[in-house]
Amino acid sequence: MDLSRRHFLKLGSALGVSAALPACSLLKLTSKEDEYVYQLTAEPAQASLVPGYSTSVLGFNGSIPAPTIRCRQGQKVTIHFTNKLDEPTTIHWHGLRIPIAMDGVPFLSQPPIMPGESFTYEFTPPDAGTFWYHPHMNSVKQLGMGLVGLIIVEEAEPVVFDEEHALMLKHWHLDKKGQWKDLMIPRYSARMGTPGEWGTVNGKHNPQYTIKQNATVRARIANVDNTITYPIAVEGVDAWVIAIDGNPIETPYQLTQHKIGPGMRLDIAFIAPKAGDKVYVRQMKGKFVFPLCEFLSEESWLASDKSIPPLPLNPIAPVKLYQAQEIDFVFEWEGAVTPADKSGHAVPNFWLVNKRAWEGMSAGHIPEPLAKLELGKTYIFNLRNVTQYHHPIHLHGHTFTVLELDGKTLEKPFHTDTVLLGKNGSAKAAFVADNPGRWMYHCHVIEHMKTGLMGFIEVA
């Protein structure tokens, strides 16, 4: 057991949860429990993803899965980042409502971090929950080859579960010998995206974890895949949805099946069954069931009269619908090829937002925003997908309150940073534009983003 793992065991005990995360927590650079200072690198590495074979990957701190960053709601976290890749990169803190200068989007919020350079990210997360971090440059390659990790923001007042497990879902573009296949094939980019063929949870294919009989278990599920939407189901216990995209819901409900698009997260909770029984986490495809991972329950002295502890709500600004301004966003398909760049490479454009394909940006060229919003005002985004493929629509720096899905008004609106639009789907998502800056707004199917389905909004 390495030092970082020992440190996390101590920290987990102090927080009242079992140290059950799949990867060691990132080692803090300070021994003070109320300070969160970390060192993080992006670098080439080797990983055993397909058993018996080694794969060249890109890893945070050379690790697959990446180390989990843990911090606390309302307390400052500092991450000293160094780029050891052979190309520029940045880190985006997905789902966190933090200042624009820390958002990790090249040219829009910071200069690219060049090979060999370092950059310090420093922010105070206002929300607790399950979030993740990834580059926002050459995303098809950098995310596809492994630069994805979790950042878990603990509640300001600790919420005590007996056990906690984090599950990062990803399909890798590998053959049977662990060698890379194409990360992006244009004919698939124009449809659902290019799917990987080797499915993993925390870098392992169909892993098994142990849980204690009668334990209250919190499972933090994160879809860090470039392409695939996972319809999630749990067998063997009654599981309850307690948070969506890091945001607790007021009234937990029993899980039957829940779709998690790329970039999205789902927190579920359950009581571990009797020793010897198993809990199965499944990916559902119609009538077909695909295993993701399983939990084996072991003997324990834990009492059997447990209940799921409630989560406090995050401090999301209440929307003022009576004075909200509505803005329509239509996501559609239109195949085209942009002019070749200086290297002679032609980049396809397949997707449009309000008739515009993302044209890219540089230090000398920032396109016009998709919309200009007034600071402090409530907006309703009317989202409409007029294509045959799913689009998880993600807004940086803000949290949506979803009011309507596919024409149906929700009795209980929920908070999220990513709205999954299905085939010909629609949604009404409201939010208060309370975070000034220029914020990326895009589909989180990475190839869709790469081939046009991206832009930004400006809040001022």
Task: Please provide the spans of the model-predicted regions.
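N-terminal export signals
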Residues: 1, 7-27
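Extended terminal and domain-junction accessory segments
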Residues: 11, 26-39, 143-175, 250-390, ...
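C-terminal segment of N-terminal export signals and the immediately downstream linker at the start
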Residues: 23-56
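N-terminal edge beta-strand
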Residues: 54-70, 197-207, 350-375
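Extracytoplasmic beta-sandwich strand-turn segments characteristic of Greek-key/jelly-roll folds
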Residues: 64, 69, 95-127, 204-205, ...
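Asparagine-centered strand-capping/turn motif at beta-strand->loop junctions
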Residues: 81-85, 222-223, 383-387
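Hydrophobic or amphipathic alpha-helical targeting/insertion segments
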Residues: 125-154
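Acidic-aromatic/histidine active-site loop/patch
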Residues: 164-215, 222-225, 354
